[in-house]
Amino acid sequence: MKQYLDLEKYVLENGTQKGDRTGTGTISTFGYQMRFDLQEGFPIMTTKRVPFKLVVSELLWFLHGDTNIRYLLQHNNNIWNEWAFERFVKSDDYKGEDMTDFGLRAERDPAFKEVYQAEMEKFKTRIIEDEAFATKYGELGNIYGKQWREWKTSQGETIDQLADLIEMIKTNPNSRRLIVSAWNPEDIPNMALPPCHSLFQFYVADGKLSCQLYQRSADIFLGVPFNIASYALLTHLIAREVGLDVGEFIHTMGDAHLYNNHIEQVKEQLSRTPHALPKLVLSDKPATIFDFEVADISLDGYNPDPSIKAPISV
């Protein structure tokens, strides 16, 4: 997609070198927006392969209100493993090799990388096979799904923001309050990772549903391709439920950054030419957005260039 390649190019040419929480370092810009017309095809990278089924299982995980990686691992989705693993290796229950700064060390030290990968595999197996262990160490805190579906009130009750949003679109589509927030300051200290994509708003006009996301922190090379596809999919799912066509997905970013150890991968991607966008295919079976399963969602005509590997910064 040209919009995304333009973002990469803009940050490479105009970004500022900054330090960051992970110690990796970034090239960063503040305040950037992309717009995608969802009528023109499903917005997923074609200049590198994005594993769409991982996008789907993560979004369904959010929609279920789940915050434990066990569901993800049961669907062969490893994108949240590092944050749960980090919590485990910092606990008194962990008795293995020292895992301090495991992400950076695995990138720089091949011998340590083998040790880290072995420990990670043991951790994943225990999460899947041991429910008690998963309950304790698979939890990521009150992240996205919890805030979307069970926002805690001061009276001890909960708010299902997503269900309320869908009902409001049906009954009051002109409302300017069609908003869901994942940013709950009270819960931030207990989250494995505070929400990067922190707030989204819907807008209805001319029989079409559009979505705007505000993302406080945008990992351009690894995270943003997932975020675009995820919120485009969410827009399609909600539009289907409320009987509207899809309009635009507008992606507004705060700190949009390229990690310093992703620069060569970015340059490789910029050398590629975008292909035609695929079409989203949804099963007619699910009654509501909350009834979808991974097998109900697919892409038709997705023929991307090969994937480009890059390390994740934790």
Curated annotation (Swiss-Prot):
Binding site for dUMP: R21, R176, R177, R216, S217, A218, D219, N227, H257, L258, Y259
Alphabetic keyword roster: Cytoplasm, Methyltransferase, Nucleotide biosynthesis, Transferase
Protein EC: 2.1.1.45
Record-linked Gene3D superfamilies: Thymidylate synthase/dCMP hydroxymethylase domain (3.30.572.10)
Cited Pfam families: Thymidylat_synt
Binding locations of (6R)-5,10-methylene-5,6,7,8-tetrahydrofolate: D219, S313
Active site: residue positions: C196
Database matches in SUPFAM superfamilies: Thymidylate synthase/dCMP hydroxymethylase
Statement: the UniProt record of this protein carries the keyword Transit peptide: no
Pathway: Pyrimidine metabolism; dTTP biosynthesis
GO molecular function: thymidylate synthase activity
UniProt record, GO biological process: dTMP biosynthetic process; dTTP biosynthetic process; methylation
Subcellular location: Cytoplasm
GO cellular component: cytosol
Main localization (coarse): cytoplasm
Family as reported in the entry's similarity comment: Belongs to the thymidylate synthase family. Bacterial-type ThyA subfamily.
Entry function: Catalyzes the reductive methylation of 2'-deoxyuridine-5'-monophosphate (dUMP) to 2'-deoxythymidine-5'-monophosphate (dTMP) while utilizing 5,10-methylenetetrahydrofolate (mTHF) as the methyl donor and reductant in the reaction, yielding dihydrofolate (DHF) as a by-product. This enzymatic reaction provides an intracellular de novo source of dTMP, an essential precursor for DNA biosynthesis.
UniProt subunit comment: Homodimer.
Protein name: Thymidylate synthase
Organism: Listeria monocytogenes serovar 1/2a (strain ATCC BAA-679 / EGD-e)
